[in-house]
């Protein structure tokens, strides 16, 4: 895996891109993004869904719609990683909509765009909801 996708490129999506660029090429999709961010390739939804790992970085109020909209378009073996600030609700949504052959890693970032900019030290709580292909271990170490 040499690239990852990010759906949602607001403040937190940009922080994710900064963190992940150290090890991956980044593809991003956002309805409102201008498509300009150093080192990020902006693609349409169809192309972002080809990535093996996709981070969902949308506001919680849009989370269920995004997950339900993409669920039927995901290929077997893809892993979805959410970065919502709450856990029960996103996990329930992902388990409800995502096929059994799609991995799920629920995370709770212990930083935000402002705190990351001040100390540049990301820390995440992670829940191995549905691990496929040992993705949880990989991302826990990253």
Tell where the protein language model's regions lie, with residue ranges.
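NAD(P)+-binding Rossmann beta1-loop-alpha1 motif at the extreme N-terminus of oxidoreductases
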Residues: 1-44
């Amino acid at each position: 895996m040499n690239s990852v996708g990010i759906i949602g490129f607001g403040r937190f999506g940009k922080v994710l891109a900064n963190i992940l660029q150290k090890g991956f090429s980044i593809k991003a999709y956002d309805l409102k993004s201008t498509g300009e961010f150093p080192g990020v390739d902006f693609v349409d939804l169809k192309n972002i869904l080809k990535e093996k790992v996709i981070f969902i970085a949308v506001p919680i109020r849009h989370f269920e719609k995004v997950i339900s909209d993409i669920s039927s378009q995901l290929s077997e073996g893809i892993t979805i990683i959410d970065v919502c600030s709450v856990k029960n609700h996103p996990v329930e949504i992902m388990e409800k909509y995502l096929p059994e052959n799609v991995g799920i890693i629920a995370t709770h970032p212990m930083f935000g765009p402002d705190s990351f900019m001040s100390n540049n030290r990301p820390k995440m709580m992670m829940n191995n909801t549905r691990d496929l292909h040992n993705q949880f271990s990989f991302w826990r170490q990253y």
